Design a protein with these regions (language model features):
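C-terminal capping/gating helix-and-loop segments adjacent to ligand/active sites or protein-protein/ligand interfaces
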Residues: 139, 306, 365-419
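Mature extracytoplasmic/periplasmic domains
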Residues: 104, 110, 270-274, 306-388, ...
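Extracytoplasmic/periplasmic solute-binding protein
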Residues: 18, 135-140, 146, 171-219, ...
């Protein structure tokens, strides 16, 4: 009995003395992850990613935070302050650089280089995910925020057989729909929805005016004739919206939209996943780009991403390596986007198969064309173009403008420029 105890003690001592690298090899890869994705197509997609990680031998521990992004960010901040950040978390756009200064992150450069990944994704995304010159986050999926969904039943009521190509054509069609008793614009009443409407209008008027005003915050661009024109168009949108949907999600109006009681929905490509999740039929919807007065493709980009936080535990470090490799794989991106209605981050994915929708194929083609012609823009309303404080200040102005018709377009332009000045200090 004494010999047996001595053997056990010797074995335990040997294990404790084993090199850390050997213990790391024995650790089962584990990922702790927090996000706001808990339901709908986003919830289904992230659950699918977790299952794939488990199939590859990992452990997936997702802690969804109910509510909007603010609640998730508060949880993340609390975990970081407590010295217990998750292995990975939802984070996007310029906030990746901001938050990387709060806590140490994982250098993903070797994995990205081995996958040849950087050359496969839009250049606008590269800088956002490698602040200070190193990859610390990875994009998961891409959406176009300027997608036009048209109710075919509504189109039939007014004899429309094609999508408008210019804002003048859009306005004429909306006028006909209103005369026919159709609410021309299906909308939501949430802040980001209001903010999207300006980027939709401005990107369809002039690509470079958008880049200068909303991405570079150039004072002249913020007060330009194109910006005034965008505010005029935004007022038209507001007049054609359902005023009874205050503070509600746009999906509340989708049943009316699918029946033809509402005509046109300007939304991100994710609406495809929402429509399918609600049991709607995409055959009842024409999906294309919002009007482009310049006659050239423009892609206003929104991307969901994960940032990887430095952890010393071998199992978490191994889990981060496994997760990062999976996120860059073509088949994983295909499955994720097919679930949510997005398009893959990789530009080399073939979308000709039956699992993809016509809307996804069209958006992917526009992304590739815009990528080649350098007409890819970053979304303001979805925190891709600016940091949260500046975005919030601008959205405040836009929300007030949309819901208060006493504010003139000229006043709207002036207030937006002033809000930017104040937010920048």
């Amino acid at each position: 009995m004494l010999v047996r105890r001595r053997n056990l003690l010797a074995g335990a001592a040997a294990l404790a003395a084993a090199p850390q690298s050997l213990r790391a090899q024995a650790a089962k890869p584990r990922v702790t992850f927090i996000s706001q994705w808990s339901a709908g197509s986003d919830g289904a997609a992230i659950t699918g990613l977790g299952k794939r990680l488990e199939e590859e031998g990992g452990i997936w521990q997702h802690s969804p935070v109910p509510g909007f992004t603010t609640e998730m960010m508060n949880k993340l901040r609390a975990d970081i302050i407590a010295g217990n950040p998750p292995a990975a978390s939802q984070l996007k756009g310029p906030e990746i650089a901001v938050w990387s200064k709060i806590a140490p992150t994982v250098n993903l450069d070797p994995l990205v280089a081995a996958a040849g990944y950087e050359k496969l994704i839009p250049a606008e995304l590269v800088g956002l995910h490698k602040p200070q010159g190193h990859w610390i986050a990875l994009p998961m999926q891409v959406y176009r925020t300027t997608t036009l969904f048209m109710s075919r039943p509504a189109m039939k009521k007014v004899g429309a057989d094609k999508a408008p190509k210019t804002w003048a054509e859009f306005n004429a069609l909306a006028t006909e729909m209103k005369k026919a008793g159709i609410t021309p614009v299906a909308n939501g009443g949430i802040r980001w929805d209001d903010g999207m409407k300006l980027e939709i209008a401005l990107s369809g008027i002039n690509c470079e005016a958008y880049r200068g005003a909303l991405m570079k915050l150039d004072p002249k661009a913020l007060k330009s004739a194109e910006m005034l024109q965008a505010f005029v168009q935004l007022r038209k949108f507001a007049d054609w919206m359902d005023p009874a949907i205050a503070a509600q999600h746009y999906s509340v109006n989708l049943p009316k939209f699918l029946k033809g009681e509402m005509g046109m929905l300007m939304m991100g490509g994710w609406a495809q996943g929402v429509i399918k999740n609600l049991g709607g039929n995409l055959d009842d919807v024409l999906i294309t780009s919002v009007p482009q007065d310049e006659g050239k493709p423009v892609f206003v980009l929104n991307a969901d991403s994960m940032i990887f936080w430095a952890r010393k535990e071998p199992d978490l470090a191994a889990g981060q390596q496994l997760l990062a490799k999976l996120m860059m794989q073509k088949d994983v991106q295909e499955k994720y986007s097919q679930t949510t209605g997005s398009i893959p981050v990789r530009t080399d994915v073939d979308l000709s198969g039956p699992a993809w929708t016509d809307g996804q194929r069209e958006a992917s083609a526009v992304l590739n064309d815009s990528f080649k012609s350098k007409r890819v823009l970053l979304s303001l309303a979805h925190n891709m173009a600016q940091t949260n404080p500046i975005t919030a200040a601008m959205i405040d102005v836009l929300t007030e403008y949309v819901h208060n018709d006493k504010v003139t377009p000229e006043q709207g332009v002036a207030r937006l420029a002033a809000a930017v000045d104040n937010a920048r200090g």
